[in-house]
Amino acid sequence: LISDLMGVVGNVVEVETSYVREYNTQYAAHILGYVQAMSEEDMEKYRPQDENSGYDYDTKVGRDGVEYTFEDWLHGTNGTARVTRTSSGTITSTVYTEDPVPGNHVYLTIDIQLQEAVERILETGIYELQLKRDEDNAKYTMEGKLDEVREDIQGGAIVVVDVKTGEPLAIASYPTFDLSSIIEDYSDLLEAENDPLFNRALNGAYEPGSTFKPCTAIAGLTENIINTETQIECTGLFTKYADQGYAPACWIYTQTDGQLTHGYDNVTEAIKDSCNVFFYTVADNLGIRKLMEYAKNFGLGESTGIELSETTGNMSNPDNHLNYDVDSWVDGDTVQ
């Protein structure tokens, strides 16, 4: 809350403004967001032409997260007090001419204990993955397999949702930052290569990878492309479009240098094994239009409705492929 303290010394009026921001957790920084001094754009929004109303010039406003989304709701109204002092500075009386009005409360669905645990797990997981990647990169470099060397892991995200209500219980993005020192650290955070201020959980758009397989499975079952007993052989490679220069591999085939495959899997086994070839085959038989229909029904490419800023993402399809410098859409693109 902001309080204006007006002290009178002779004929001089001194105006002092104090700010207090207290956080009860060192976690959830991307969710809570932070405040900063007003920009010129903020001035136009929060200081109308009548300068006797609106925010003071030195007011800090929400810049991200809940602080930004609910700025108007959380802000409250300044209070003023007239303070009388002696010539030596001793306060003789304080008269509150206008009491401050606190802002409203915002209640989140976030379980803070779960949030803290998820952030710790995410940080530890990325650290361990990077150690393994460093070992692999060193090995590939020694063996001269420079095309196998991969970039450092820049970050990650975890979202935990109540499956019955859809409410988010934890939203973690790594790397993160310390809200209690955001002002002092802000310049360094802006220049950091791994972009700690960026909320990867809500604002990043990434390929879904194997998490898309249940969508393909449900579409295939519903459209009678497969049933629960249908078996598809994983030979390690999906070769139907090899003549077009596209023969994607199953992960197990790649990781074992072509030594292992999943053999015959039904849909349950394919999900358990995360068999790429099984789902390449199902997707190919479905076709992109039908696959798009089911993806949209699952909410992919659509806004979730969360109050915080989010990126909706996009599913490649024949209607938007020209945006990616692709001349035409072929069946192999559906598999991909």
Segments (PLM) and residue ranges:
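Small/polar-residue-rich segments within soluble enzyme cores
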Residues: 1-103, 120, 127
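Low-complexity, polar-biased intrinsically disordered regions enriched in Pro/Ser/Thr/Gly
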Residues: 41-56, 135-148, 336
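A short acidic, often aromatic-flanked loop/helix-cap motif at beta-alpha or helix-coil junctions
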Residues: 20-23, 115, 313-315
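Solvent-exposed, polar/charged alpha-helical surfaces in well-ordered, non-transmembrane soluble domains
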Residues: 3, 7, 29-33, 64, ...
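A generic secondary-structure boundary signal that marks alpha-helix termini
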Residues: 40, 79, 127, 131, ...
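Conserved, well-ordered alpha-helix/loop/beta-strand core segments that scaffold catalytic motifs
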Residues: 2-5, 91-155
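Beta-lactam-recognizing serine transpeptidase/beta-lactamase-like catalytic domain environment
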Residues: 85-97, 110, 136, 142-143, ...
